[in-house]
Amino acid sequence: MNRARIAAFSGKELSPLAAITPIQESDLEFDYGSFDSEAFAAQTLSGPQALAAVIDHTLLKPDATREQVENLCDEAIRYRFACAMVNPIWAATAVDALSGTGVPVGAVIGFPFGAVLVSTLRQEAEALIRLGVRELDMVIPIGQLKSGNHHAVHHTVQAAAMIAHHHGALLKVTLETALLSVAEKLRGGEIAILAGADFLKTSSGFAGGGATPGDVALLRGMAGARCGVKASGGIRTLADARALLEAGANRIGASASVAIVRELGAV
């Protein structure tokens, strides 16, 4: 990818963004450090424990109950999932349930549409981190990205990243790939990385489309080893997870986590 474009994205002065031409798939050069997807997938799929360690055990249904959240946390402890991912209203419950277990709590912000004010996003992030959340999954301002307002996209992601990183938390940025063109996926991913994203995430699961191996490979090709790639949305089987890991994902978000891990063997 043209380094002049990257320099413009990454500088503190954001005005050059307006003059940057759209990023196309043909611009990709795999020169950001190697991520060996094949080796990572082979290691991760070597056993149920290794697979569980890269899965965000997720419950984001609007009608989720306390009992279901507590069950999610019990499963996260038993299977040693990467984290338990919940809606903000259940963050305190999850933090209490997972205290002292070594399993972190994740929660969503600006979810599921990415259409909140930056001030609201900051407040959500700060409140959740105070509760003990250690992984934040936000949704990129999709409409701003599609409108070409790259300053707003960068500012929004950077605001959340600064809060997360100040407290040692991770930030995953959902692009909602089902709603984006190839150029928008690449542009959104590049902006998110340079604004501080620790992971690019494919989907919220609420926009009519989920993770595909093609989108994961596209994001990994653009990101290289600069950040993680989280595949989420519609992942229900071990075959789904395998295809996405082999395409370049190093984190999976799923509500069918237990069933996926059990397909690989007993824990």
Language-model-derived ranges and their functions:
Residues 1-55:
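Charged, compositionally biased N-terminal leader segments and the immediate start
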Residues 40-79, 83, 89-96, 100-229, ...:
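Alpha/beta enzyme core
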Residues 232:
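Short hydrophobic "strand-cap" motifs at the C-terminus of beta-strands
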